[in-house]
């Protein structure tokens, strides 16, 4: 699922957690002023589902779907409403939650098409080099299909757009 995460000033915490709470139609409580609350409804920034994983941190919907994909929250993981409702129905209290800060994502489709995505370094935590990307692609056997100049341009852009590399096959 695509997500929005915490701003640089309020980053989403990386680590291993477990779902602590689940709530339908949650009430939003302003982290700056706990007296300021918004009941469930179209004006609630949490949307209609809350999956709490660490104190005040959670995974939730949003009333601003255009914000998904950015560094926009107070540290929570923000999802499109239909996505969080799907996730909510699949998990239960106690389900493991693994939050990783990883700027490069490699995807291998069932038809063996390999693609990669490079995301912005919103927290200035993960400097990427061409070698880092090549090493990640090597794990899928497609590192020789990407030129260093093209990888460097993708790192410079860091826009999260897909780069389709090749179809990988094991030959016997």
Predicted region positions:
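Short, basic/aromatic beta-hairpin or loop at an interaction surface
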Residues: 65-75
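Loop/turn positions that initiate beta-strands
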Residues: 93-97
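Short, Lys/Arg- and Gly-enriched loop/turn segments at beta-strand edges
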Residues: 105-112
